[in-house]
Amino acid sequence: ILLCSNNESWGAYFFDEKEVVARAQTSWQEHPFTEYLEFEFNDFTENSVYCALNWGEKSIPFEIEVDISETVVNQLRNDLRGTARFSYVGPLEAADWCVSNNTNLEEALEWAKLAVTMDKQFQTLKTKAAAEYALGMNKEADLTMKEAMPLAGIFELHSYGRQLITEGKVTQAMDVFTANLELHPNKWPVNYGMARGLSAKGDYAKAAEYLKKAEVNCPDDNNREIIKKNIEKLGRNEDIN
């Protein structure tokens, strides 16, 4: 298979080697009759796909593989030269993607700093801290999160605490849930968060106390039913996370 930069010519009557941009070895395969030339894509993975050129009673399959990190990062850079740069959302999403995929971390930190400059809020500071943690800048990241905490809403802190539990950072999660309790006392999600943190630490009795408080303040039947089931789990010394 030869892929050429010239897509105007018909067939190979006036083939020019200098226009070849990629080549691959493949073999014909039998295929149900296809009257019109078609390209079929199958077997998708994160960084590859199989393409088949089908025509007549033949199929010519070949694999296309790309460096997904390099491809996406280049696109992010290009996007941030346009309208995406006019809002904090553009650099924030670019930084988030890089941190989530553990790639291009230095530039991700610069994008996160730009997002903070444009709109200092919990999410932008949290992403900046995530980039700093990924780069091993733990002291700086701790200070960034300390700055972010007072700017967060109830559910933002609750979600962040749950994220930390998932990452195995139970002590840090407990600090977040405690901060949420101090900032937003007597709210059912806050008490639920305290219960999750204490459950992760293995203190099921104390966790049940907070979960019972959450049950009293819970405004809807669906969540109240989930809380009841989790109280039962804690009574059996089972983690609710």
Kindly label every feature range from the protein language model.
Residues 1-86, 107, 114, 118-119, ...:
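Long, contiguous interaction/recruitment modules in multidomain scaffold/adaptor proteins
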Residues 88, 122-123, 153-157, 170, ...:
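Helix-start (N-cap) detector for alpha-helical repeat units in TPR-like alpha-solenoids
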Residues 93, 127, 159, 193, ...:
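Canonical tetratricopeptide repeat
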Residues 96-97, 130, 162-163, 196:
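Residue-level recognition of tetratricopeptide repeat
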Residues 101-102, 135, 167, 201, ...:
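Structural motif corresponding to the intra-repeat A-B loop/turn of tetratricopeptide repeats
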Residues 116-117, 149-150, 178-183, 216:
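Conserved structural position within tetratricopeptide repeats
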